Regions:
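Subset-of-secretome marker
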Residues: 3-4, 20-228
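Exposed boundary/loop context
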Residues: 11-13, 157
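N-terminal export and membrane-targeting signals
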Residues: 1-10
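C-terminal motif of bacterial Sec signal peptides marking the signal peptidase cleavage site
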Residues: 15-18
Length: 228
């Protein structure tokens, strides 16, 4: 009898907790003009200590899948893949590091150099040169501005849910894509979803304000020594 009573109490407590969390107060974004919601989302993202970004982008017609952790004022790190060629990326300040799979190095450096670079990191500038375009992915403000900078006319479709989270949906009339922004609490971006991820990419944002330790790899090879 005591066990049964305890179980009932636990279930009741969980139900109460669940009801409380589902009633989170609206942040008012559902009633704002679409462009203002975008502005608020970018501002919120810029003020966050950290974020996880996963999904895909399209660069020069080529899809790039990614899973990155970005830490404000530090840099970012994570894994990416382009045309099936996997590589890891780290940026710390103005330094960038990349480590490709054997297939990646063979594709971009040739078989001879690839054998020398097996399981090695390359080091270069994050501001200029071969790695600059990649390292912009580890700056949340630049990533969002790039992703949202070319949108068409946006329409605020109001409050809805996305994967169980209360969000505001902004629809791009020209592409059919949708930007989801949190409808409760701080208006962080939640996801950018395109009708054709292969052509336009789709991104998910999460773990806002969570930070991770990002450290430089030891023994990195200077990209300049390879002519990069």
């Amino acid at each position: 009898m005591r066990t049964g009573a305890l179980a009932i109490l636990l279930v009741s407590a969980l139900l109460v907790a669940g009801c409380g969390s589902s009633g989170a107060k609206s942040n008012g974004e559902a009633q704002k003009a679409a462009q203002q919601v975008v502005t608020d989302a970018i501002s919120a993202a810029a003020g966050a200590k950290g974020v996880r970004v996963s999904g895909s982008i399209v660069s020069s017609g080529t899809p790039i899948t990614l899973d990155l952790r970005i830490v404000k004022g530090v840099g970012g790190s994570g894994d990416l893949s382009e045309q099936g060629l996997a590589f890891s990326l780290i940026r710390i300040g103005d330094k960038a590091y990349i480590k490709g799979s054997d297939a990646f190095y063979k594709k971009f450096a040739g078989a001879g150099v690839a054998s020398l670079l097996h399981d090695k990191w390359l080091e270069g500038s994050a501001a200029s040169g071969s790695l600059a375009s990649l390292t912009s992915l580890t700056d949340i403000s630049k990533l969002l501005e790039g992703a949202l900078g070319s949108h068409g006319t946006l329409k605020n479709e109001g409050a809805t849910t996305y994967k169980g989270q209360k969000v505001v949906a902004l629809e791009d009339a020209s592409t059919g894509g949708t930007l989801y922004v949190a409808a409760t609490g701080t208006p962080y971006p939640v996801a950018m979803v395109s009708p054709s991820a292969a052509k336009q990419g789709s991104l998910t944002f999460g773990d806002w304000n969570k930070t991770v330790s990002i450290t430089a790899p030891k023994g990195a090879v200077d990209l300049g020594s390879l002519g990069g």
